[in-house]
A protein has these predicted regions:
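Terminal alpha-helical segments
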Residues: 1-113
């Protein structure tokens, strides 16, 4: 996928999950959506800033550190932990969903900067 496609995917996912943030039973979907949108924003940001990106979330933190994007790597790894707790575990409260959206906002801002 090209940078433009990653940006469109991120924007589409954000438009879908942000309205759900106030729906308590939607926390799992909000967290997963924030994670997915963040992945696409990272791909977009890497493509536009470094002329390369990774099409897999596997070892994405390592890839980002190699590019000198340590802060983004930490945001990604934080969000990945929230996702694991939200999707596979019991951490599905609105606070976790809100945290996921806050991390997404940081990544979104970085990608467009």
């Amino acid at each position: 996928m090209l940078a433009k496609g990653h940006r469109q995917a991120a924007e589409d996912i954000e438009k879908t999950v942000i309205p759900l943030q106030s729906t308590p039973y939607a926390a799992r979907v909000v967290i997963e959506g924030a994670w997915g949108a963040a992945f696409h924003w990272i791909a977009y940001g890497c493509a536009t800033k470094h002329q390369k990106h990774q099409d897999s979330h596997s070892r994405l933190g390592r890839f980002l550190r190699h590019l000198g994007e340590g802060t983004v790597a930490r945001w990604w790894e934080d969000l990945d932990l929230v996702r694991q707790g939200g999707w596979y575990g019991n951490n599905t409260d609105p606070t976790a969903a809100q945290h996921a959206l806050e991390v997404l906002e940081h990544i979104h801002t970085w990608a467009l900067s």
